[in-house]
């Protein structure tokens, strides 16, 4: 399920390759709104995108590689922005709400991605984006904990990220508004840090 293979055009900066990639990702988003990943095949995707199978395989090794690229396009920039402005001492609820607003109109597609083989790879990317930020946020509180070392900070950061990610995914499954998801995550944050 490699997304990028040497010689593939999925990461090319050539305008034609970018247009093709955009068409494939757009087609995948559209199909994911009504089809679980397990029901999608390359033939459906290329038909929806208006490209040939040959062109598809010039960009991606398989369907799951494209689904992962689609999921990354849907959330990666939003998570990077969230990590950049993250601070649990400021308006965390607003930050979560802004993050979830990026998925408005794409909940069905997001649920199908959550239920797909690429879900764990996508979660790993979220952890990679959020871990340094969360680690530093927790470091500022480490004086309150006896024996807090780097391993404990990493473990706690991973724990917080996974728990938050679970709440976000459950909110999407339930069709909750970005504001409701933000409120729920904020309530949990307050309890965990005893505010």
Description of each model-found segment:
Residues 82-109, 119:
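Hydrophobic alpha-helical connector segments
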Residues 31-65, 69:
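Helix-turn-helix
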Residues 29-34, 39, 76-88:
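Terminal helix-turn-helix DNA-binding modules in bacterial transcription factors
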Residues 16-28, 45, 70-74, 78:
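Generic hydrophobic, amphipathic alpha-helix propensity
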Residues 1-18:
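N-terminal intrinsically disordered/low-complexity leader segments
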Residues 81-85, 110-117, 138-144, 171-175:
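Secondary-structure edge/capping motif, primarily at the C-terminal ends of alpha-helices
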Residues 97, 118-145, 151-165:
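Amphipathic alpha-helical packing segments from all-alpha helical-bundle domains
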Residues 1-5, 136-140, 170-195:
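C-terminal peripheral helix-coil segments that are non-catalytic and often amphipathic
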């Amino acid at each position: 399920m490699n997304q990028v293979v040497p010689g593939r055009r999925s990461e090319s900066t050539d305008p034609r390759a970018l247009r093709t990639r955009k068409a494939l990702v757009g087609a995948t988003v559209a199909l994911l709104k009504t089809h679980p990943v397990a029901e999608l095949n390359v033939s459906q995707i290329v038909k929806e995108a208006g490209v040939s199978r040959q062109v598809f395989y010039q960009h991606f090794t398989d369907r799951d590689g494209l689904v992962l690229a689609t999921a990354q396009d849907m959330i990666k920039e939003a998570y990077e922005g969230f990590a950049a402005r993250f601070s649990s001492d400021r308006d965390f609820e607003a930050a979560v709400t802004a993050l979830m607003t990026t998925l408005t109109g794409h909940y069905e597609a997001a649920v199908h991605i959550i239920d797909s083989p690429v879900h764990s790879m996508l979660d790993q990317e979220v952890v990679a984006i959020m871990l340094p930020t969360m680690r530093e946020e927790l470091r500022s509180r480490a004086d309150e904990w006896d024996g807090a070392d780097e391993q404990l900070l990493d473990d706690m950061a991973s724990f917080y990220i996974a728990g938050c990610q679970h709440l976000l995914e459950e909110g999407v499954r339930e069709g909750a508004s970005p504001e409701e998801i933000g409120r729920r995550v904020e309530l949990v944050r307050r309890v965990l840090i005893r505010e």
